[in-house]
Amino acid sequence: MTKKIITLVGRPNVGKSTLFNRLSIRKKAIVHDLPGVTRDRKYTDGKIGSFKFLLIDTPGLEENPDNMGKRLMEQTTQAILEADLICLMVDGRSGVLPDDKLLSSFVRKYNKHCILVVNKCEKAFDFDKEYYKLGFDSIVIISAEHGTGLIDLYDEIIAKLSIKESIERNIADPFRGDCLQIVVSGRPNAGKSTFINAIINDERLLTGPEAGITRESIEIDWQYKNTHIKLIDTAGLRKKSTITASLEKLSTSDTINAIKFANTVILMIDALAHLKQQDLNIANHIINEGRSIIIVVNKWDLVEESEKEAFQAEFYYQINTHLPQIKGVPVLFISAINKQNIEQVLDACLKIYKIWNKKITTGKLNEWLNFTTKVHTLPLQKCGRRVRIKYMTQTKTRPPTFKLFSNNPEKITDSYTRYLVNNMRDTFDMHGIPIRFTYVKNKNPYV
């Protein structure tokens, strides 16, 4: 049995994202008093009691939409078409507004199961007969923020979908289990959403020339070469000093959190804007979090053919100079809008994910260590004894982390550590990922 799909629809700031978070198994939507925070349709696994379902949050819709509003309407229309049940939400504090009437007419023409959800009813609620004039036979009064009325909502959902009380059993989920989480990150307007739309061949995410369209992380399940992938679109990251609005601070926090839990991060760079310090700052954050990373230069079709060779040479020089921690990181040049080289990006993600998970046997490690330290010996101490690394072992993967035992670890210089790390990359084919070394002092200083 596949999961039922429930779509939340309503004008801006009626509490759709609050209810989305309330019903979601884990919080996924940014909530803010500013209308219009949600701009893409957003999916999550939801649950009321023992009933599990797929929940879709949609952008708020208004009358007389501008160009952006028309694109938001397309997102909502697609979510309605996918739905088994629609929850049309209105604000109980403000009563029925013209936009509510417009939306009720819009929703009813699809002939879907529908519940009118009157939200923000924390206090004694004087029910307005105007709600009945919207044309729905099922009306539920709730407070999404405080969680009141959810039992009534549950009962209405069960009745509308004719679900029997066998819902305690697990509902089959084709995407259950391990998956490769790929976060697409970068500065605003680099083409992150356009890239994901190109991968899935669907205008799933809102795109346009305006910077900062994406305001929260959007997850999309996808299958590629027998691998379950979760593609995660994120809000663009700007310099801290340029972030002033509280909403953008929330969006930035959401992106940082997505990177923290990613397996692989695609750092998307706008070819027309070239490599900026903020791109390097984002890359360093990804590295510090220990994530695997690939660098994708988008809008390659807009670079003059005569300039491409010089562009690439300068780009590789900047990456190798400023990001030595990920020497050999994959760099791909694509056009997301033309779908040029986009599959190469996913191939690179699969490859670097395997490297990020690499485990090297202790025997091979110490054979390599013995040879490498003989080729380039460690320095002598003042007492005349040589600093030695006696033994090493791999303590974890994701990223590969190693513990090295030395008679005097504080005397091992950063330059010697870089020598070991770079040699390890070449020997074990571990290019493009962070590698971590931890030094431990031997109990016996004379060995």
Swiss-Prot record:
Residues 358-443 form the KH-like domain. CDD domains: EngA1 (cd01894), EngA2 (cd01895). The lineage of its organism: Bacteria, Pseudomonadati, Pseudomonadota, Alphaproteobacteria, Rickettsiales. Associates with the 50S ribosomal subunit. The keyword GTP-binding applies. Residues 4-165, 180-357 form the EngA-type G domain. GO terms for biological process: ribosome biogenesis. Keywords: GTP-binding, Nucleotide-binding, Repeat, Ribosome biogenesis. PROSITE patterns: G_ENGA. GTPase that plays an essential role in the late steps of ribosome biogenesis. It comes from the Bacteria. It holds the Pfam family MMR_HSR1. This is GTPase Der. GTP 2 binds at residues 186-193, 233-237, 298-301. HAMAP family: GTPase_Der (MF_00195). Coiled coil: none annotated. GTP 1 binds at residues 10-17, 57-61, 119-122. Belongs to the TRAFAC class TrmE-Era-EngA-EngB-Septin-like GTPase superfamily. EngA (Der) GTPase family. GO terms for molecular function: GTP binding. It comes from Rickettsia typhi (strain ATCC VR-144 / Wilmington).
